[in-house]
Amino acid sequence: MAATSGGCILTADLPDPALDVPANYKAAAGAPDKALPSLDWWRGFRSQELTVLMEEAQTVNLDIAAAVARIRQADALAQTAGAALLPNVTGTFSGSRSRSSSNTGVISAGSSIGRGEVTNHVASMSASYEIDFWGKNRDALLAAEETANANRFDRDVVALTTLASVANAWFNVVASQERINIATRNIASAQRIYDAIKARVDAGTGSELDLAQQESVLANQKASVPPLRQALAQNANILATLVARPPERVRLTGGSLGSIAIPRVTPGLPSDLLTQRPDIRRQE
């Protein structure tokens, strides 16, 4: 009995540790915001395209789908582990038919004779139950259930990581488009200056040195565009991977950084925010 009681203590839920934390601090900058951030935080940027990508990633992302499959697998294993705590019932039924050379014979239980044919029916049922004296089966069930719960927190971690990756890739796309537009305007401006200097050189009032310097500036401006286009394509491909679509089917309008709303970030986030982190909840 002592060993059995010890096993029960190991599977009991541990109480939350009581910490002597002051309610207020001397260096507090003011009353903190008690409201927790919204779970759909991306809506604060007021971008319809970003919202669509976020919602699509939550339903079709392959990493999230794999995490959900692991949850289903863990639930099935937990059900299998729980079956050991239930009685085991088995039943059998068999029948046979034979033909005899005569119509005479003995009729016994489970058999019948008719016109030289003998039919036998045999049915049996048995039940067994394993007494979980040391708590092995129940501990196995609890371990399987905790594994399933841990997989649910892992799924939340994957979802948060995926959503953060979608947001970062989309903002990189918008930033790359903005930089390409700026570089295009710089090229046009450098081209106009180059044409003006060349016109003065042709008229004999300009310097060949000024023309060569401006030609170098124009070449540098043009050379800055291909890396920006490559970065734009790479981030667009990242978005396509995150939403499980071919890159050719991803059409991004992007826009400009100036058109994106900046959510208000309040100082003094509540410490309860840490309890929403799935990695911390998994360890607990």
Predicted feature descriptions by range:
Residues 1-59, 106, 145, 229-275:
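Terminal intrinsically disordered/low-complexity segments used for targeting and assembly
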Residues 10, 40, 46-53, 68, ...:
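Small/polar-residue-enriched beta-strand and adjacent coil segments characteristic
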Residues 60-61, 203:
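Charged, alpha-helical scaffolding/interaction elements associated with membrane systems
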Residues 77:
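Acidic, glycine-rich calcium-binding repeat modules characteristic of RTX/beta-roll
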Residues 155-269:
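Periplasmic alpha-helical coiled-coil/stalk elements that build and connect Gram-negative outer-membrane
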